[in-house]
C-alpha cells in the first residue's frame, strides 16, 4: 500500500522494527481507512478484498478525505486472496454480511500467534474464534466513515478504536506499537459485553430511523417528531441489554446520535435503497435473540415495528 499523495501524518519516524505484514480483510470504508492509517504509520499492509475489489484497490486505489485535514490522500493497496505469510496483525473489517465469505482467506496455521482484531458488528463471534484461533480480540470503531466508489470520507472528529481484552491477554500489549503514528485514539476495555452494547445501541437505532425515513441522521435530529423517538428507542435497546446484567447509561448514547455529522449515512439506509437486507438481518437477529434471552416481548416493541416496516420496504 503506497500513498500517491501526501499523507495525513507528516512526522518523521523510523519504520517499525517488526517488518511482518498487517493483513486487513474486507472491502468497505473501514477496510480502506484502517489500511491507509497503518500505511501512514510505516507498516507493510496487505488487503484481502475478493477478486474484483483486489483488482480495483491495486490498480485504481482509493482517495481518503478527512474533515480534520485539508489534504486529499491517495493510496493503492497491495492485495492478496489469502494470508500467505505469518503476520504481526490480522484485522477483520468486513461488513456483517461478508464476514463468512472473508474467513475463507484465513487459517490458524498461517496466522500463528498474531493477534486478530475483529470489527464485525455481529454479537456472537465464537465461530470466528474457532477458525482464527484463541488470540481474537473484539474491536469497535467509533467514527463516521462513508465510501462512494473510490472515495472514502471520514466525517467529524478523530475516530476512536476500542479493543477489548480477551482471556489470553498478556502483559505485553502489541497494539500501542502497531497503532503508533496512525492518528487513531486507541482505548483498551475489559468489559466486552458493555463495549458491544455501547457500540450497537446507537448503531441500531440510528440505522433503523434513518433507513425507515430515508433521511440522514443529521436531518432526523432537526425534525422534533423524529428526534423524540431516539431516547425511547435507545431506552428499549438498553432494556434488552439489561438481560445480560448490563445497565447502560442512555444519555451519552442519545447524545452520540444527536451529534452525528451532517453528511453521514448509516449502511442500512443505502442498503435498502439498493434492495439489500444484510444489515436489517443483522440488527434484527441481535435484538430478537437478546430480547428472547432477557424474556422481553420484542414483538410489542417500537424497534420491532420499525423493523417490520423496513422489511416491507425491502420487499417492495
Predicted regions and their residues:
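NAD(P)-dependent Rossmann-like dehydrogenase/reductase catalytic/cofactor-binding core
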Residues: 3-6, 45, 231-316
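NAD(P)+-binding Rossmann beta1-loop-alpha1 motif at the extreme N-terminus of oxidoreductases
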Residues: 6-72
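A structural signal for isolated positions on well-ordered beta-strands in alpha/beta enzyme cores
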Residues: 23, 46-47, 117, 137, ...
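Rossmann-like NAD(P)(H) cofactor-binding subdomain of soluble oxidoreductases
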Residues: 69-152
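Rossmann-fold dinucleotide-binding core
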Residues: 122-199
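Helix-loop-beta segment of a Rossmann-like dinucleotide-binding subdomain
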Residues: 151-162, 214-221, 265-274
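Active-site-proximal catalytic alpha-helix in oxidoreductases
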Residues: 193-221, 225-238
